[in-house]
Design a protein with these regions (language model features):
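A bilobed periplasmic-binding-protein/Venus flytrap-type ligand-binding module shared by bacterial periplasmic
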Residues: 74, 307-309, 349, 401-432, ...
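Aromatic- and charge-enriched surface segment that lines or borders ligand/interaction sites
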Residues: 90-194, 240, 354-357, 425-436
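Gly/Pro-rich hinge or "lid" segments in bacterial periplasmic/extracellular proteins
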Residues: 75-78, 196-238, 242-344, 349-353, ...
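N-terminal lobe/hinge region of extracytoplasmic solute-binding protein
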Residues: 41-110, 287
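Extracellular/periplasmic solute-recognition and catalytic clefts
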Residues: 295-306, 331-332, 344-418, 444, ...
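Extracytoplasmic/peripheral linker and loop segments enriched in polar/acidic and small residues
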Residues: 22-26, 31, 174, 391-395, ...
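Structural transition elements
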Residues: 292-293, 456-503, 523-531
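Long beta-strand-rich cores associated with HINT superfamily self-processing modules
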Residues: 654-691
Length: 728
């Protein structure tokens, strides 16, 4: 028994000593906190698609934008967002050609342009990551093509292949990537966009679909022999893309991983029999030229990005927007990226343990691609003095900013009460009704109550960060607000009531019938008893109007929108790319949801607006385009087809030791910019996770007392035995 007590005391003592080095609650291997590794989490499932032709989900972007390298990207710090070259040597302006192939001047009207030709130089010396698809033997033959079934028996990851190699990126790899977007075997979500804009894409897609039906069907559909007339390699480092007509926004598609290069060797490698059964596909193990490569992938458990040893390195930016210098975001100016050796993503199914580990220091960023953590924790700090003190004490960086998205309340242009109107007189009355409702809805109060002040009230269809957006007070909506100096103030309810009277609804009643005017809000979900709808009713009630809610499930709501059966509704839009056209198209007549199946959910139609839109969409970025945008904004502010609603904030939560963190949902390749102070992380984790040993002190004393008593009893027993022996 004495031996057991000694063992228990020894264990407790060793545990206490261990607490001086590595926290006993650490979820990671010993000393991992001291490594140049960033730890983050994912909460639902492993990425579904890492093939650039297929990947279209936000949770996949930390991987795809770190592994693949499009021609263009976005400047990490500048706002409004601006493009920069990535794999391309420079940003290029297109050459415009007419229908006869003759060159047109740069300012040629869009209607005259038949082809926009981009000749894009690619940086020489860019290499693909090491991968077995490139490996060759001593005779120069590919080691892993063709493969025999026994050779694949124990291979379930790229790390299971002994040999890897690489080769230089060429323009042909971009040509191959564009062809893959037309492949019937992939069904890329942007094939329709490419067919609309890239010369020859539609014809290639038709040819591939026909050829893929032939028998026998090969395991690999080799795209190299096929021609895509609008995408060609002029030489090893020059890519030519020909776009139908004039489409200045095409450059933004070149900043998406859809158009990132794909080596034909990788597609052929993964097409071999039994590869898919071993989870060896481009969807699971991508091959790119970016700063990181996927080196570990345990489905729904853990994924690891490691520094690509063949990545050339790119300099950290030296300029940014106002405030970036003070925020320490320019300290690494000119240093070669990436800064991290690895990024580890671990599955956390529940938010409570995820946030618990973040507050303990075991996650550097809760989730890289999600923009709600900084917002939620900022709100929590505002609501709780204890949480505010905790976050402050731990130095957490909670950074939020408006994002390129918008939520608005629309008026259905086909509705007889709030819509366009059948006559000029009715159109003017309906406009004044919409203006009155727009004044009555206090979106500042809405943002304060329901968004916890983590949003910005919108005055136009454009959010901050998009070229053409005008900040206050210049951008204030003059029909809903007054401007005095730098102060912007919502117009009074008396002005709203006067507009109602002019619209034919004095005190909220129809002047002809005396009946109260009832407006209808169409929504998804419950029956309108929640706090949001109650708030809406109170807003309209202030000017004598009544609001009735028509709530339906999602499918029926979508059907009502397609049929134009809704009257008022809330809709949202998240930008695909930071161009005003991306938002202004939501009010373009030919995009009407009812009439054309487009994204104009309000079915708004204005000849003046449509003419300006058709002019704007052909303009290159610059003062001329911004002037047209301002005119378009004036038109919709006057017509009021929307209450412009609000622009929500997005933000990140970062540990104090994470450097260069600037949240953005538009910029997806942020991992290469992050740097960590691993020593500071070790110190803080030890500080925040010190074991609480005092509850063990009484146990130690009891064990010590028991050990002393047992030892005393044993000594007494030996003494008595010795005395008996002497007596005998």
């Amino acid at each position: 028994m004495l031996a057991r007590l000694r063992r228990a005391l020894l264990i407790l003592g060793c545990s206490a000593l261990a607490a001086c080095s590595e926290p006993v609650n650490s979820p990671y291997e010993e000393h991992s906190a001291a490594e140049n590794v960033l730890y983050s989490a994912f909460t639902t499932r492993s990425p579904n698609h890492l093939d650039p032709a297929l990947s279209y989900s936000g949770d996949e972007t930390p991987f795809t934008y770190s592994i693949y390298e499009p021609l263009y990207g976005y400047h990490y710090l500048d706002r409004p967002y601006r493009l920069i070259p990535k794999a391309a040597a420079e940003l290029v302006e297109p050459v415009y050609l007419d229908a006869n192939g003759r060159r047109l001047p740069a300012d040629a009207p869009g209607e005259q342009v038949a082809i926009s030709r981009y000749d894009i130089p690619i940086k020489p010396g860019i290499a693909f990551q090491p991968h077995p698809a490139f490996a060759r033997d001593e005779q120069g033959q590919y080691r892993y093509y063709p493969m025999r079934a026994p050779d694949l028996r124990d291979a379930f990851s790229i790390g299971d292949f002994l040999h890897t190699d690489s080769r230089e990126l060429t323009a042909q790899d971009y040509v191959y990537a564009f062809k893959r977007l037309a492949s019937p075997r992939l069904a890329s979500p942007i094939s329709g966009v490419m067919a609309e804009h890239v010369r020859g894409f539609k014809e290639l897609a038709q040819q591939l679909a026909q050829d893929d039906k032939r028998s026998p069907r090969p395991d690999w559909l080799d795209l190299r022999p096929y021609t895509l007339s609008g995408v060609q390699a002029l030489d090893e480092h020059t890519l030519r893309i020909e776009v139908l007509g004039k489409y200045p926004q095409f450059k933004y598609w070149l900043a998406m991983t859809f158009t990132a290069p794909v080596p034909w060797e990788a597609e052929r490698f993964y097409s071999q029999p039994r590869m898919a059964q071993h989870n060896l596909t481009l969807d699971s193990w991508p091959v790119g030229t970016g700063p990181f490569m996927l080196t570990e992938s345990q489905t729904n458990r853990r994924h690891v990005l490691s520094r690509n040893p063949l990545y050339r390195g790119e300099p950290y930016p030296c300029v940014g927007e106002a405030g970036d210098l003070e925020a320490g975001l320019l300290e690494d100016c000119g240093k070669s990226m990436p800064f991290l050796d690895k990024v580890v993503f671990s599955l956390e199914k529940e938010s409570v343990p995820l946030m618990g580990k973040f507050l303990q220091g075991y996650y550097d960023i809760p989730q890289v691609e999600r923009g709600e953590y900084g917002v939620a924790m900022t709100v929590a700090a505002n609501d709780s003095a204890d949480k505010a003190a905790l976050y402050r004490e731990r130095g957490l960086q909670l950074r939020t900013a408006p994002e390129a998205q918008l939520f608005y309340m629309g008026f259905n242009w086909h509705d007889p009460v709030v819509g366009k109107g059948d006559t000029p007189e009715q159109a003017e009355r309906n406009r004044k009704l919409r203006q009155a409702v727009s004044i009555a809805f206090d979106w500042e109060e809405y943002v304060s109550i329901f968004m916890n002040d983590q949003a910005q009230v919108a005055h136009s269809p454009l959010p901050p960060g998009v070229p053409g957006y005008q900040p206050l007070p210049q951008g204030a909506n003059p029909y809903v607000y007054t401007v005095k100096g730098q102060t912007v103030q919502r117009r009074s309810l008396d002005e709203a009531r006067e507009l109602l009277r002019e619209a034919g609804y004095p005190d909220g009643r129809d002047a002809r019938t005396g009946k109260p005017l009832i407006l209808y809000y169409d929504s998804m979900g419950g029956m309108g008893s929640d706090a949001t709808v109650d708030w809406m009713r109170r807003q309209l009630g202030q000017v004598g109007l009544q609001l009735e809610v028509r709530a339906t499930d999602y499918n029926r709501f979508q059907d009502k929108m397609k049929r134009g059966a809704a009257q008022m509704f809330i809709w949202g839009w998240v930008a695909d790319y930071p161009d005003a056209e991306n938002f202004l198209t939501l009010l373009y007549g030919p995009q009407s949801k009812v009439d054309h199946g487009g994204e104009n959910a309000a079915n708004y139609q204005s000849d003046a607006y449509d003419r300006l839109y058709e002019q704007m969409r052909f303009l290159n970025d610059g003062p001329d385009k911004e002037a047209v945008i301002r005119e378009m904004v004036k038109v919709v502010q006057h017509d009021a087809p929307w209450m412009f609603g609000y622009v929500p904030n997005a933000g990140g939560a970062y540990q104090v030791w994470v450097r260069n963190a600037k949240p953005s949902l538009m910029i997806r390749d942020s991992l290469q910019y992050y740097r960590i102070d691993a020593q500071q992380r070790v110190e803080r984790i030890q500080e925040w996770n010190r074991p609480v040993w005092w509850p063990a002190i009484p146990l130690l004393l009891m064990l010590a007392a028991l050990a002393w008593a047992v030892r005393r009893m044993a000594r007494q027993r030996r003494t008595r035995a010795a005395l008996r022996k002497e007596e005998s």
